[in-house]
Amino acid sequence: RGLGDVYKRQSLGQVFGAIFHNDQILWPSLAYLLYSLAYVITNGVLFYMYKFVIGKPNDFWVVGVIATIIGFCISPMFPILNKYIPRKWLFIAGQTCMVLAYVLFIFGRDNVFLMDLGLVLLNINFAQLVTVLTLTDAIEYGQLKNGQRNEAVVLAVRPMIDKFTGAVSNALVGYIAIAAGMTGSATAADMTAHDISTFNMVALYIPLAL
């Protein structure tokens, strides 16, 4: 049976029960929730940043190229690094890269190199990879602690978080577009200081705090 079928059979009560009765799932899940929420919100507004804030919509293609290249490099590199570097430090490194990315997005918009560097740092997803491995390890921990092996329930945690953060991101991106006047035939020249401030607050400052 496919994992999709397994996930469908798990009720929300079972998933939340697995989270709250296994502290090794609870804290990584919370960390992943905050990471995922920040990442998907920022990723969802990058087009608006390039079109309405920076005024270079034709340069938006570089976002997908950098994300693809970094994704292909980081995933195979992670297990090699993990042989020599503890997961805790890889997680901290991933979060540090993300914070630096936000700093560059806020202060380095006029510099193409700094913007590209910010995109590189944003896509270094060590935090995500560490969380996935920690949740997998939590299956054994839960069996030792509670006497039950809830493998399917534990594996359903991450997809559930992804769906939740995706829904929140879609709502916030729509709100940002309307609240900051980034709709219709508007251009970067039409943006006021208030519009940019609204964009920065929801698209960058709040995710940075997360």
Where are these regions (language model features)?
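Structural signature of the two symmetry-related core transmembrane helices
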Residues: W89-L104
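A membrane-interface helix-boundary motif in multi-pass transporters
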Residues: Y175-A209
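Helix-to-loop junctions at the C-terminal end of transmembrane segments
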Residues: I74-R87
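Short, small-residue-biased leader/transition segments that mark boundaries at the very start
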Residues: G2-Y7
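Hydrophobic core of transmembrane alpha-helices in multi-pass small-molecule transporters
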Residues: F113-Q128, T134
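Pair of pore-lining "gating" transmembrane helices in MFS-fold secondary transporters
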Residues: F20-V45
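A late C-terminal transmembrane helix in Major Facilitator Superfamily
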Residues: Q148-A180
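Short amphipathic helix-loop junctions that connect adjacent transmembrane helices
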Residues: G44-D59
